[in-house]
């Protein structure tokens, strides 16, 4: 450290000053001796007496200080000693000596080259007692001290001297104290100050742990120090630090954390303010009280709920206080005989919680609603009575013609803590006539080798007049894979044609006007052993009889297959009171033959849908969003994750709340239809949900939606080959349906779905119906909506639908595809379309439509349905076009495509017309002749100038004839210029 010393050497006195600023003493240094701080004389021992001399001066702050100097440079063999007083070492083991001094350059003193020195020696001696007599040999040399800078005569003249600072280590020291000694051997030196100190690691707080002053033990190792936690904190990991020999703290390990109700602020743990809390020990900060809670004092670990607000026992303190929800709203009941479906809306006020559930309280009431009692334990709730998470429940097994009141409680996690009354909504209903209860016992009366006679008691609760009983039986070993159903009017029956020595399983259920009751439990009975054997004398007779029977059966089956009269089951009358039906898996099927079964023939739609569709667990279905609304409810997109299978995207149709039984039957009917189809161009049914609400139909998800919307969105973006590929897929799907004997009735581009690979699939089977046994027979509808613009003339006129009428609709779909989703007959009303089609008007070819495709459209639009191609032929035609793309380059001529006009399939030669009447007859608009007779448009020349408004004035108001006449007029103009043009 360089400072400047201004000194006056006069009569042994000097004044010291320093032009530089002194650094403050570090906090980790503890002084044992500092000569500058001693008031008065230092009193150190100087030997010999004419050696070191104590003088007074002032420092840079003009504070008086005592210093020692010596300058015996003229004499040889100088040995001047200066010893300090005894210095206690306290706890130090290693001490540091800091010397500040000035030293005269020997070269600046004349005649002293042989005797002048520029160094002095530093010594020390340990001692347990002070007052020890000075003896040179007892001291141990620490070091020889030399000046970094010395002063000259010139410096003396300027009174500016340079101050040197040197620090030396001493130790380890073991005794209670020590002396320092300075030996001069002939230098001109002044000791400005002497400071003796040791280093310590000072008190500090680290990681909320306090570490005390610590003195290093030796010069080699670190001292491990255990910290103690500050107030209102506790150890998380034991806090430790290491004190180095340089008095520095190193390597903090572990820490303390503030207690609950306190947070770290600097080096302390401070209590949370009112309105804030901290629930647990740790480094977290105090948090503001959650809604509807507060604190009034410092250091709170949780917040108290406001009046009428609560926090459940397991709720974390950070959760807002809540209250019970309000009552459910908009309760709707849908009664079905002795069951009821209850639907309701969520409470307006959830109380601030999401864990809302619903409990159903059932009460059976007399005609006076106030006189009620709890319902019988036999009443069932689906999915359950308590803890419902959805807003619907089905209640079954109610008594017929009985009043019930249902109270729907809304509860959440704090409802049990609240004292206010229950929050519920109530609805009262009266049940209708119910199906009969099960037959409880079946008794075996007689048994033979091939028959069993059974009897049973009427159900305990018939709930009406028993119409008949259904007896279902099958061989036990077949496990219900093939069963027989027999109907009986009484409570007994004899089943014959059984196998000897065979166990059969029987179930019986009763039927009333309200429908079938549930099946009885299963009863097992065994026929008698077979004691009959074929002897030698009659074996040939038996073999002939068996052969004849087999031949008759085979012939009967073949006949049924050829005429298409096989209906899935065999009927035969056994008596006036019994009917027998035999099923294989519910329907008898022949290898290689797949026939569509109309689900509407089933009395119970649920039985039909379970026959053809897979029941899904609603928990495996997740709904993402609502994408539209259908006839029966919402249409959603979502995901289906079946066990051991990959999650797939699906479309979900739901049955709306408050449905009628007919709507439910139609809804499940559509699923029963789809479930019978398995073709890459038919929408695939993934399954149904009928055992929970809402009921759902789950199908594969088609990313691009309906074909018409998709084409409009991507107008003119596909090649002709791509469009033909789409059409080929639709035709292939329709061929599959036709082969199954199935009529769609609503084939349109809006009912074709397209996926991301541009694969088209037929969908929407809401209007579909089954064909009769004759493949060319028609199903006559009983009314309902018909899509006029897509429907064939015979279907519009006579309500008769066949596969040929589907071919007509396919022609319209073909037109929609080639026009990129335009609406057919877009400028015409439905009535105009019906009249125009009946008069043989047809849609014009779309822009740039290949002639081969337009010809296929016209073939599909033949008035005689027998002249239309079959779907098999359409698939073949499209395959040929795909294999020969050059044939698609021939575009329909402009002459055959008047702009925005319908095109008559008949070619009219205008040159053959001589009068207006001939012309109108040629266009099949003879009914307009009387209108034009007697008016100014009585000749071809005058009528060529007619406009649409002019036709309306004279009475031609139907759009079809209007457009036909205008089209022919344009052709007439072309004829007058270029010759005849076909129209």
From Swiss-Prot:
The Protein kinase domain, residue ranges: 621-882
Record topological domains on the Extracellular side: 21-540
Glycosylation sites: 231, 336, 390, 403, 492
Enzyme class: transferase
Cytoplasmic domain ranges by topology: 565-983
Residue ranges of domain SAM in the record: 911-975
Keyword Transmembrane: yes
Residue window of motif PDZ-binding: 981-983
Domain called Fibronectin type-III: residue spans: 324-434, 435-530
Stretch forming the signal peptide: 1-20
GO CC annotation: early endosome; extracellular region; GABA-ergic synapse; plasma membrane; presynapse
InterPro entries reported in the protein's UniProt record: Eph_TM (IPR027936), EphA3_rcpt_lig-bd (IPR034266), Ephrin_rcpt_lig-bd_dom (IPR001090), Ephrin_rcpt_TKs (IPR050449), FN3_dom (IPR003961), FN3_sf (IPR036116), Galactose-bd-like_sf (IPR008979), Growth_fac_rcpt_cys_sf (IPR009030)
Domain Eph LBD: 29-206
Modified residues (Phosphotyrosine): 596, 602, 701, 779, 937
Processing and modification events after translation: Autophosphorylates upon activation by EFNA5. Phosphorylation on Tyr-602 mediates interaction with NCK1. Dephosphorylated by PTPN1.
Domain of life according to the entry: Eukaryota
Record family assignment: Belongs to the protein kinase superfamily. Tyr protein kinase family. Ephrin receptor subfamily.
Assembly information from the UniProt record: Heterotetramer upon binding of the ligand. The heterotetramer is composed of an ephrin dimer and a receptor dimer. Oligomerization is probably required to induce biological responses. Forms a ternary EFNA5-EPHA3-ADAM10 complex mediating EFNA5 extracellular domain shedding by ADAM10 which regulates the EFNA5-EPHA3 complex internalization and function. Interacts (phosphorylated) with PTPN1; dephosphorylates EPHA3 and may regulate its trafficking and function. Interacts (phosphorylated) with CRK; mediates EFNA5-EPHA3 signaling through RHOA GTPase activation.
Protein's job: Receptor tyrosine kinase which binds promiscuously membrane-bound ephrin family ligands residing on adjacent cells, leading to contact-dependent bidirectional signaling into neighboring cells. The signaling pathway downstream of the receptor is referred to as forward signaling while the signaling pathway downstream of the ephrin ligand is referred to as reverse signaling. Highly promiscuous for ephrin-A ligands it binds preferentially EFNA5. Upon activation by EFNA5 regulates cell-cell adhesion, cytoskeletal organization and cell migration.
Listed name of the protein: Ephrin type-A receptor 3
Lineage, broadest ranks: Eukaryota, Metazoa, Chordata, Craniata, Vertebrata
């Amino acid at each position: 450290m360089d400072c400047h010393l201004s000194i006056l050497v006069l009569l042994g006195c000097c004044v010291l000053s320093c032009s530089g600023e002194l650094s403050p003493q570090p906090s980790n240094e503890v002084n044992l001796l500092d000569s500058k701080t001693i008031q008065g004389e230092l009193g150190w021992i100087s030997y010999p007496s004419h050696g070191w001399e104590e003088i007074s001066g002032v420092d840079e702050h003009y504070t008086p200080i005592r210093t020692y100097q010596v300058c015996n440079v003229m004499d040889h063999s100088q040995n001047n000693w200066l010893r300090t007083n005894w210095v206690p070492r306290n706890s130090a083991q290693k001490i540091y000596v800091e010397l500040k001094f000035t030293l005269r350059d020997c070269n600046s003193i004349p005649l002293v080259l042989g005797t002048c020195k520029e160094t002095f020696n530093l010594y020390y001696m340990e001692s347990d007692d002070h007052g020890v007599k000075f003896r040179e040999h007892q001291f141990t040399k620490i070091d020889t001290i030399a000046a970094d800078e010395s002063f000259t005569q010139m410096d003396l003249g300027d009174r500016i001297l340079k101050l040197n600072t040197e620090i030396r280590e001493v130790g380890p020291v073991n005794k209670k104290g020590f002396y320092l000694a300075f030996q001069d051997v002939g230098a001109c030196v002044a000791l400005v100050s002497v400071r003796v100190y040791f280093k310590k690691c000072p008190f500090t707080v680290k990681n909320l742990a306090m570490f005390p002053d610590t003195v290093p033990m030796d010069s080699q190792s670190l001292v491990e120090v255990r910290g103690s936690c500050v107030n209102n904190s506790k150890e998380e990991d034991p806090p430790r630090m290491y004190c180095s020999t340089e008095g520095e703290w190193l390597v903090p390990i572990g820490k303390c954390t503030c207690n609950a109700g306190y947070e770290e602020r600097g080096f302390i743990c401070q209590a949370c303010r009112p309105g804030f809390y901290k629930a647990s020990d740790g480094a977290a900060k105090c948090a503001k009280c959650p809604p509807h809670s507060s604190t009034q004092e410092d250091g709170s670990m949780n917040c108290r709920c406001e009046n009428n607000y609560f926090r459940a026992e397991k709720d974390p303190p950070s959760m807002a206080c809540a209250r019970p929800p309000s009552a459910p709203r908009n309760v709707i009941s849908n009664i079905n005989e002795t069951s009821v479906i209850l639907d309701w809306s969520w409470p307006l006020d959830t109380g601030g919680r999401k864990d809302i559930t619903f409990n159903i309280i059932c009460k059976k009431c007399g005609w006076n609603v106030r006189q009620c009692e709890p319902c019988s334990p036999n009443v069932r709730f689906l999915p359950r009575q308590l803890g419902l998470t959805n807003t619907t429940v089905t209640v079954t097994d109610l008594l017929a013609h009985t009043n019930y009141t249902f109270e729907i409680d809304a509860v959440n996690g704090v409802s049990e803590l609240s004292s206010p009354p229950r929050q519920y909504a109530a609805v009262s209903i009266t049940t209708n006539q119910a199906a009969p209860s099960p037959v409880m016992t079946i008794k075996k009366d007689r048994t033979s080798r091939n028959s069993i006679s059974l009897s049973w008691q009427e159900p305990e609760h018939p709930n009406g007049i028993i119409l008949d009983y259904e007896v279902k039986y099958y061989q036990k070993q077949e496990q219900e894979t093939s069963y027989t159903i027999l109907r009986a009017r009484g409570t007994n029956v004899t089943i014959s044609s059984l196998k000897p020595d065979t166990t059969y399983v029987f179930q019986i259920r009763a039927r009333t006007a309200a429908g079938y009751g549930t099946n009885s439990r299963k009863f097992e009975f065994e026929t008698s052993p077979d004691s009959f054997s074929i002897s030698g004398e009659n074996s040939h007779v038996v073999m002939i009889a068996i052969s004849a029977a087999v031949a008759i059966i085979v012939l009967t089956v073949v006949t049924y297959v050829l005429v298409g009269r096989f209906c899935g089951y065999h009927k035969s009358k056994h008596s006036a009171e019994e009917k027998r039906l035999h099923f294989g898996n519910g329907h008898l099927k022949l290898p290689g033959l797949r026939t569509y079964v109309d689900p509407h023939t089933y009395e119970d739609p649920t039985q039909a849908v379970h026959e053809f569709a897979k029941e899904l667990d609603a928990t495996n279905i997740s709904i993402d969003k609502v994408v539209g609304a259908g006839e029966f409810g919402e249409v959603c997109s979502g995901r289906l994750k079946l066990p051991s299978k990959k999650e797939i995207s699906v479309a979900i149709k739901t049955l709306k709340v408050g449905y009628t039984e007919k709507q439910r039957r139609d809804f499940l009917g559509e699923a029963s239809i789809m479930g019978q189809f398995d073709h890459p161009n038919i929408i695939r049914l993934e399954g149904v949900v009928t055992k929970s609400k809402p009921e759902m139909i789950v199908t594969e998800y088609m990313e691009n939606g309906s074909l018409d919307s998709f084409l409009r969105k991507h107008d003119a973006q596909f090649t002709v080959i791509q469009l033909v590929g789409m059409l080929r897929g639709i035709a292939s799907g329709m061929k599959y349906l036709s082969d199954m004997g199935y009529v769609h009735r609503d084939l349109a581009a809006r009912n074709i779905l397209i996926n991301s690979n541009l694969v088209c699939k037929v969908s929407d089977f809401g209007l579909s119906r089954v064909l009769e046994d004759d493949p060319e027979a028609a199903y006559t509808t009983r009314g309902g909506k018909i899509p006029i613009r897509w429907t064939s003339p015979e279907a519009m006129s006579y309500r008769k639908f066949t596969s040929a009428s589907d071919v007509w609709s396919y022609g319209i779909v073909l037109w929609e595809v080639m026009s990129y989703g335009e609406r057919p007959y877009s400028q015409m009303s439905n009535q105009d379309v019906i009249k125009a089609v009946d008069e043989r008007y047809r849609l014009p070819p779309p822009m740039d439509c290949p002639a081969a495709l337009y010809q296929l459209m016209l073939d599909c639009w033949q008035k005689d349905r027998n002249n239309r191609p079959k779907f098999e032929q359409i698939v073949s035609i499209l395959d040929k076009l795909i294999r020969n793309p050059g044939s698609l380059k021939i575009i329909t001529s402009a002459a055959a495509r008047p702009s925005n006009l319908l095109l008559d399939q008949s070619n009219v030669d205008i040159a053959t017309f001589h009068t207006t009447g001939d012309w109108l007859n040629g266009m099949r608009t003879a009914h307009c002749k009387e209108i034009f007779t007697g008016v100014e448009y009585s000749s071809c020349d005058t009528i060529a100038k007619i406009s649409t408004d002019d036709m309306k004035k004279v009475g031609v108001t139907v759009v079809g004839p209007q457009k036909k006449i205008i089209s022919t007029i344009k052709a007439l103009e072309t004829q007058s210029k270029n010759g005849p043009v076909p129209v």
